[in-house]
């Protein structure tokens, strides 16, 4: 649905495989065409397909690390699609823990 100048609708994955939410998040899909939005579903580290390989890797299972993962992906998308960070919005979506992540991301990374 994306067209230049449209926002990124960014789903912050939570405590399950992100594919469970792709078809259950109608709000994003219903509004994306009207806004020309790029729709992205990002999976949370160590959930879904990305599993913990060993106990030492668990140190990276934190809210702070999850937020940094999402910010890194958003930065990559903004560069890849030549977004104007001053004008083009990133709108976070999520439910349950993912909803809290969306709120925390907005507070910690308002840009």
Q: Where are each of the predicted segments found?
A:
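Gly/Pro-rich cap/lid or specificity-loop segments adjacent to the active site
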Residues: 2-111
């Amino acid at each position: 649905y994306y067209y230049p100048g449209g926002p990124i609708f960014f789903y912050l994955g939570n405590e399950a495989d992100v594919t469970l939410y792709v078809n259950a998040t109608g709000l994003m899909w219903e509004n994306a065409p009207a806004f020309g939005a790029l729709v992205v579903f990002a999976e949370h580290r160590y959930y879904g397909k990305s599993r913990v390989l060993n106990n030492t890797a668990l140190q990276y299972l934190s809210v702070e690390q999850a937020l940094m993962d999402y910010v890194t992906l958003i930065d990559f998308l903004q560069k890849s699609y030549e977004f104007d960070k001053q004008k083009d919005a990133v709108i976070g979506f999520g439910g349950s823990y993912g909803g809290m992540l969306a709120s925390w991301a907005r507070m910690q990374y308002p840009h």
